[in-house]
Amino acid sequence: MEAHQFIKAPGITTAIEQAALAAANSALANAVVVRPFLSHQQIEILINLMQPRQLVFRPEVFWNHPIQRVIHNELELYCRARSGRCLEIGAHPRSINDNPNVVHRCFLRPAGRDVQRWYTAPTRGPAANCRRSALRGLPAADRTYCFDGFSGCNFPAETGVALYSLHDMSPSDVAEAMFRHGMTRLYAALHLPPEVLLPPGTYRTASYLLIHDGRRVVVTYEGDTSAGYNHDVSNLRSWIRTTKVTGDHPLVIERVRAIGCHFVLLLTAAPEPSPTPYVPYPRSTEVYVRSIFGPGGTPSLFPTSCSTKSTFHAVPAHIWDRLMLFGATLDDQAFCCSRLMTYLRGISYKVTVGTLVANEGWNASEVALTAVITAAYLTICHQRYLRTQAISKGMRRLEREHAQKFITRLYSWLFEKSGRDYIPGRQLEFYAQCRRWLSAGFHLDPRVLVFDESAPCHCRTAIRKAVSKFCCFMKWLGQECTCFLQPAEGAVGDQGHDNEAYEGSDVDPAESAISDISGSYVVPGTALQPLYQALDLPAEIVARAGRLTATVKVSQVDGRIDCETLLGNKTFRTSFVDGAVLETNGPERHNLSFDASQSTMAAGPFSLTYAASAAGLEVRYVAAGLDHRAVFAPGVSPRSAPGEVTAFCSALYRFNREAQRLSLTGNFWFHPEGLLGPFAPFSPGHVWESANPFCGESTLYTRTWSEVDAVSSPAQPDLGFISEPSIPSRAATLTPAAPLPPPAPDPSPTPSAPARGEPAPGATARAPAITHQAARHRRLLFTYPDGSKVFAGSLFESTCTWLVNASNVDHRPGGGLCHAFYQRYPASFDAASFVMRDGAAAYTLTPRPIIHAVAPDYRLEHNPKMLEAAYRETCSRLGTAAYPLLGTGIYQVPIGPSFDAWERNHRPGDELYLPELAARWFEANRPTCPTLTITEDVARTANLAIELDSATDVGRACAGCRVTPGVVQYQFTAGVPGSGKSRSITQADVDVVVVPTRELRNAWRRRGFAAFTPHTAARVTQGRRVVIDEAPSLPPHLLLLHMQRAATVHLLGDPNQIPAIDFEHAGLVPAIRPDLAPTSWWHVTHRCPADVCELIRGAYPMIQTTSRVLRSLFWGEPAVGQKLVFTQAAKAANPGSVTVHEAQGATYTETTIIATADARGLIQSSRAHAIVALTRHTEKCVIIDAPGLLREVGISDAIVNNFFLAGGEIGHQRPSVIPRGNPDANVDTLAAFPPSCQISAFHQLAEELGHRPAPVAAVLPPCPELEQGLLYLPQELTTCDSVVTFELTDIVHCRMAAPSQRKAVLSTLVGHYGRRTKLYNASHSDVRDSLARFIPAIGHVQVTTCELYELVEAMVEKGQDGSAVLELDLCNRDVSRITFFQKDCNKFTTGETIAHGKVGQGISAWSKTFCALFGPWFRAIEKAILALLPQGVFYGDAFDDTVFSAAVAAARASMVFENDFSEFDSTQNNFSLGLECAIMVECGMPQWLIRLYHLIRSAWILQAPKESLRGFWKKHSGEPGTLLWNTVWNMAVITHCYDFRDLQVAAFKGDDSIVLCSEYRQSPGAAVLIAGCGLKLKVDFRPIGLYAGVVVAPGLGALPDVVRFAGRLTEKNWGPGPERAKQLRLAVSDFLRKLTNVAQMCVDVVSRVYGVSPGLVHNLIGMLQAVADGKAHFTESVKPVLDLTNSILCRVE
């Protein structure tokens, strides 16, 4: 037996699963988001109605009509996306402000429910005017809306949208109204339930309840809380039945979208409507069963015989179908009514097995059940009778046929053969049955209803109406009637413009003559200031325009206005005609609506009217929120300053380009004459007249949004192909306002002789210009260097000269794409019109250039050669061609081979269009090489630089070279200096090497390569394999030229080294410098010694070296080796030297860097010069830096000398950076916390903590008494009385202090460092032994260059250089200065925020020299301590948060021991300092360095900006080892003073510490240490504790402290600029990221530790979500400063 079907195929299974997953992901990505809260039944209804669309439920709002509104929103999106700029009928008031594409809205005066809708309409924006006119009965304020209704308005528009607003109009009325508007298309959303076709009654379906009384129908959907739809029955019936309107205003009605019984109808004006039958309800889930007995009626003398009064019942289609199948197949003896009733009762119960619904069921009333049983029984009885009769009559017929003789059979056989339409079988006889008989059935199935009725428009003549009624009467009788009246062809709108929102002019020829406004007018910018504000222009442009005045010469001729604007030394021309295209800075298009008879202009949201008056030209500007009049006096204005005009034009250009980059849709492209002209802001037909070739339109006003995607093919070498002449523009444009000069002919070469196998030039198909303009939906996937492009989309959107059809061998209409070609261009398949054949391909020019290409049929045979030939045969043409993937449809050619064949056989500029499946394949297999796009602006600027360069002696080789717009593929190998990039190139890989200098050229030639400098290489790079060494330093115009001319290009270089220098200072080099992305990075250098690597590691973080030289940099020694200088003057002064720029790429054994004073600006502006100079040697480099230029950029001997002086060694250590990762959203409980109101959150926080709004901004506490030291005061203690803050709330939850106040600085100095120090002279051995529990004996510590690098890296990250690091000279005050400044950070507190009496916080920063001296040692000691820490002990923040949280979670049975040090810094004394020095001795630090540290700490001077304090012993918060020694002292105190049982976790950071244990007690020696040092310890022992911004909950983990973080936000000043707010918002986002998986746990735990309600924490998280989303509200407050300072008592020690 065969068993292959039982063999499991893992590959196929995996592919199927991946395809299913991809389909599911695609469905979810394009799902409909359902925002309202819904019941379970409503969700099931929506899922059934919206099939097959995927739904995503995100409940966040309550709607009165949730089901209808979801459907409405979906259909609205479809209508608005298709209609573009349009006229809207009956818009909902709340949608006005959200849809700026609507040019006009037609309303009716409000009545009934409409009044309530207008009261809830927005009171701002365009809706405000509409609301005011609707509620007050006022006329419309502008042309954007009216209250005349759709049928009473005549605003011209080509496209319309009606969303559920045409139920009270018939199709004929709509056709007439569309004709009045000149409308050709109307998208109408209508609710058309099938029950309106039935008699009056009450119909309940699974979705809605419908009540039908004969005239009106009321529909209420499941879950509606207010009245539903209420419409006229006759209109709904006509909308369901009608597919076309005939008469003087013909229409075609097409159903383009349907969701349930909600339809989108596309009404299109068509001269000859054709029959378009349609099935409106193919997915109906109900069948309507008729009851024999109708409802009770009114009393009457005689019983009624009207059959239309009977009642119908909605029955699920599956119930009726199953019931009929069961009854029709029952045995004759088993068929009875009771059996039908039993079966119906069984299938009416809903049965669910697990998650599978086995039987959907039906919840029906008794009346409906009775009607269904009756109808089903009678229908089945009738069918059974027919079955019996048919079998009986058929048997008798068979008996007669079998008894026929030979002659009769022969006679029948001959006549059957002669018949053309042969259908087997025979009808025996006609069964008498009519539609209204009982035998016709009792049910109506909407799934099989077909309608194709026409409605005549009401404007037909009486004769036409009479004949129409006669025809309809004859049809009602069942007779065919040929109407002799043809539909009258009426106007269907302006056909001259293919613009969806074109507003034609309704001009009455009988109106008065047009007023003439010709003349010269003075237009000052000050008169148009309100308009500038409405245009939302920047303040700079408004200010510059206000200082300018223009002279405008207006000429009006034949409904057209020409303006000549004189602005300074510039002249602009504009031409105003109706329908002119206005330039925009985005994809959206605007056309000018100009009515000369009405003296009006309009486009987009702006309109104006003008009139000649005695004072001059009076213009009224109208827009949203703007109604401004301006009068321009006749005459000539004084000439504005050329400098002001140029600055205005440049600023305006920058604004246009910035708006172009940021806008998705775009707005007007503002020209100077458009803002300083009488008809602002319009400037159609803009021309800037300028005789200077370096200014004007070509350089300043260059837009990237063009009318067409013109493909320009780059110049190709003459290879025997047919030359391509210049092709006229293929974009259909409106008639220009002014005659345009003829285009210059393209200097293309003469056609050469055709290649073998190609047709002669005379036989080549020559393409005429093609006009094409349509909406683009294609998507660019890739662009090749030759200009060819790959698109995803429809082939017919292309603007190429030729279209390629996937044809068959006979070139007859077929299926697939060939059928689409036949539908659009049927004449192209006429073989008589073929102008040329090439192999199997046929060329035709009728009705447009088309190539019928024939691919092989892979169903029969795989033939790659024929596939190549199919593409090759389409290249015998002039112009570009748009291709499909030949053969991938019906012929089943794989996508890959067909695509490869096109790549090898196409011409430059061709286009390939892929369907979605092939597009996905291409995106998964697209070329991986990076590409450089050369835009028109870059090409133009590069060519200008080449022209300037070719005029010099060096650049003569570049004469005639051009850079063309396009895309270039390249390979870029980047690497650190000396990484061997050049050595990796072999002669077999390259034809030409381009290098920037002669030295490099000679070096390459010595290796056997053909190397050239950039200018001379222009003769040899065409079509060659090119390697460009030191590519970033090449002049960018030459780099672009060689990259574009080369067949393949491989770039070598270092992006961090010297870029190309603009020696001419023309500004062209930085304008076209390309942004090159390295394809590979090499990080290992074979040249640079170790110390050089450490100095440049800031630019190369991953640099490594193979050099064994450890120290190579020396200062102050005699010059050796090659001299390197920075300027040409220094080169002249030092014979034999080369500049750093010339030495780039070279390698020397020894070098001497000579920095002269004239190189200061160069080195400060380009640190790359210093990097190049430092990386040229392999053994030794002597630096002669008399002016100290290299020191200013962080390269000095002070850092290195101090490092080695302190005992540093060259070597490698473990880096101090701790790897951290972002937690995955594996639970993502944060998603359950939506953004909430910040006001309510902060008010609730204030209530829970007992804080109230503070009447002051800060508090200056009383200054403590100075107990030790000497304080120097300024003569004046000036203070500001108030503070301006930009805050989230006026309730602050932090201790309030004033860091910028001078008195606050004094209070902090004295309070922290002026307190008397309690000295304690004792041995450190006991404390060190106790500390060994956490930090064992450290031993000798090695300080390496790794710590030196980390020090330099930290300085660079802070924006510092090495200039502040000095030689270690203690006589120099700058070496030992300690700077004090007030800290702008206040502590969060749950207690008193004002009357706390505590001084502020400050930082005492040591000098950069001391930081560089001690910093590497302290980093090395810290690394040693981290390596010795026991398990469960955490130091500082040198650990991953997840590891700490896991350790806390593991300590389930522990309590939290917390210690709060008070006055931690000020209580440190000689004993703590001695312990630090003892540990330094233990680590092997030099004794002189330890004694220096002890000296600095024991007696010091803190230097504030205007104050200073001389003091003793205190700990400094800004010294290099602050965190290290504070943490060590904290550990020593805790472990010496307390004993812990079952210690699980201990964490120390500065003065903050926690220990997780089961019990603790104070150790015997604790009292001596606490009393001797004057320590102030506050211990707390509780189940949950706080530590370093997190909540420590044993068994649960370390959770973010939401309350503390939110409280600290209240103290932050979010101003004055947006940068500060952005920083804080990023901090909030980072904090929320920590809450991703533990948000709900935080609510429970944080609320317990602070004793607040969980709702508060929940509300605070929502508030933080709102802040992170940028939805925070800020309040600017000006509050006074409370001064509580008293006199400062000084006492000299």
From Swiss-Prot:
Reactions catalysed, as given in the entry: GTP + S-adenosyl-L-methionine = N(7)-methyl-GTP + S-adenosyl-L-homocysteine; RNA(n) + a ribonucleoside 5'-triphosphate = RNA(n+1) + diphosphate
Gene Ontology MF annotations: ATP binding; cysteine-type peptidase activity; helicase activity; metal ion binding; methyltransferase activity; mRNA methyltransferase activity; RNA binding; RNA-directed RNA polymerase activity
Keywords per UniProt: ATP-binding, Disulfide bond, Helicase, Host cytoplasm, Host-virus interaction, Hydrolase, Inhibition of host innate immune response by virus, Inhibition of host IRF3 by virus, Inhibition of host MDA5 by virus, Inhibition of host RIG-I by virus, Inhibition of host RLR pathway by virus, Inhibition of host TBK1 by virus, Inhibition of host TLR pathway by virus, Magnesium, Metal-binding, Methyltransferase, Nucleotide-binding, Nucleotidyltransferase, Protease, RNA-binding, RNA-directed RNA polymerase, Thiol protease, Transferase, Viral immunoevasion, Viral RNA replication, Zinc
Region named NTPase/helicase: 960-1204
Region (Hinge): 712-770
Keyword Hydrolase: yes
Region entry Y-domain, spans: 241-439
Source organism of this protein record: Hepatitis E virus genotype 1 (isolate Human/China/HeBei/1987)
Record's comment describing the protein's domains: Contains a methyltransferase domain, a Y-domain, a putative protease region, a zinc-binding region with similarity to calycins, a proline-rich disordered hypervariable region (HVR), a macro domain (also called X-domain), a helicase domain and an RNA-dependent RNA polymerase domain. Since the boundaries and the activity of the protease are not clearly defined, the zinc-binding region might be part of the protease.
CDD domains documented for this protein: Hepeviridae_RdRp, Macro_X_Nsp3-like
Ranges annotated as biased composition (Pro residues): 738-752
pH note: Optimum pH is 8.0 for GTP (methyltransferase). Optimum pH is 4-7.8 for FTC-casein (putative protease).
Name of the protein this chain belongs to: Non-structural polyprotein pORF1
Gene3D superfamilies reported in the protein's UniProt record: Leucine Aminopeptidase, subunit E, domain 1, P-loop containing nucleotide triphosphate hydrolases
